[in-house]
Amino acid sequence: MKAEAVESGEASTIIAAPKRGINRGISIADLILRGVAAIGTFASALTMGTTSETLTIFTQPIMIRAKYNDLPSLTFFVIANSIVCGYLVLSIPLSISHFIRREARITRIILVIFDTAMVELLTAGASAATVVVYLAHKRNANWLAICQQFNNFCERISGSLIGSFASIIMIMLIIITSAVALSRH
C-alpha cells in the first residue's frame, strides 16, 4: 500500500516531521548558546573589571597597586567583553522569535553578520589581554614577571581569559548553527 502511495505521487508527512524537529532543535541550541555566551562574557568583564591588588613593600613605606586599567590591553578586553555581552543580551529576543517563527530568514542573516563581527571583537580583546597575561606570568626583556608578587591579580585575569575564550567558542557554534538553519530553508 505504501509503495502505491509513493508511485501515485502522494506526499508523506513522515519526512516533514523530522525537518520541523531539527529546526526547532537548532533554534533551541541557538538560544542556549547565546545565553551561555552572554554569561561568559559578563563574568569575564566583571572579573577583569574588579581585579585589583595592592602590594606593600616592607623596606620602604611604598604601596604598589596592580589594576586592570593600568594596562590598555586589559581595558580593551573589558570593553570588548561588555559590548559583546550587551549584544548577546539584545539578540536573545530575536533568537526567541526564530524559535516561534522558523521562516525568519532575514533576521537570521543579520544575526550571522553581527555574530561574526562580535566574535572578531571578542577575539581581538582576548588576544590583546592574552599577551599581557603571558608577560605577567613569564618575563620578557623589557617586562618583569609580576605574578610572583601579585598572585591574586594574576589568577583573576587568567580566569577571565578562560571565560572569554569559552565565549568565543560559543559564538562560533552560534554562527555554525545559524548557517545550518539558513541552509535548511
Swiss-Prot record:
Cytoplasmic side: 1-25, 97-108, 182-185
Pfam families reported in the protein's UniProt record: CASP_dom (PF04535)
Membrane topology, as annotated: Multi-pass membrane protein
Positions in the Extracellular compartment: 47-75, 130-160
UniProt record, GO biological process: cell wall modification; cell-cell junction assembly
Example of a GO cellular component annotation carried by this entry: plasma membrane
TM annotation in the entry: 26-46, 76-96, 109-129, 161-181
Top-level taxon of the source organism: Eukaryota
Keywords: Cell membrane, Cell wall biogenesis/degradation, Membrane, Transmembrane, Transmembrane helix
Subcellular location: Cell membrane
InterPro entries: CASP/CASPL, CASP_dom, CASPL
Record keyword Transmembrane helix present: yes
Major localization listed first in the record, in broad terms: membrane
NCBIfam families tied to this protein: A_tha_TIGR01569 (TIGR01569)
Family to which this protein belongs: Belongs to the Casparian strip membrane proteins (CASP) family.
Function: Regulates membrane-cell wall junctions and localized cell wall deposition. Required for establishment of the Casparian strip membrane domain (CSD) and the subsequent formation of Casparian strips, a cell wall modification of the root endodermis that determines an apoplastic barrier between the intraorganismal apoplasm and the extraorganismal apoplasm and prevents lateral diffusion.
Assembly with partners or alone: Homodimer and heterodimers.
Protein name: Casparian strip membrane protein 5
Organism, scientific name: Populus trichocarpa
